[in-house]
Amino acid sequence: MAQSTKGAALVLSWQRCGDDSHWCSFLSVNLDDGSLAKGGDYVIWAEDADGSRKETVYVGQGKPVSNCLARHRDEVAITRHQRSGRVLRVTWAEVKKEHRGGVEHFLAQALQPLEGDRWSDDDPIQVNLPW
């Protein structure tokens, strides 16, 4: 598990896809990927096709992350953000169980997702943001 502390922050290894390390497509990322079988925190966002104008759609945590993402693929509140000229992206990081709630809380505060209104009550744990 690639987690270290840098000052007071927890440093996470945010996952990317492909040999060129591009941001993963939320709707087509391979949910059988081994890194998604672990527990962690994740961020779903919408952006223009050229990667500009990122808007965080949802942050969450769970184990396995693949099950969480599969469930979100069926939620119109999330998928509706992929529309003309906009694409949905996802990244995730393996996070120890005892830190997941705090990381989720921090991500929700920092990224202000458009969807979701219930996040962990754990004290926020500062982490490096994906972008």
State where each predicted segment sits:
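A broadly used, surface-exposed interaction patch
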Residues: 66-89
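Coupling/hinge elements of helicase-like and P-loop NTPase modules
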Residues: 113-130
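GIY-YIG nuclease catalytic motif and its immediate N-terminal context
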Residues: 1-63, 71, 98-109, 129-131
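Nucleic-acid nuclease catalytic cores
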Residues: 86-100
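Short, intrinsically disordered/low-complexity patches at protein termini
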Residues: 76-77, 81, 92-94, 124-127
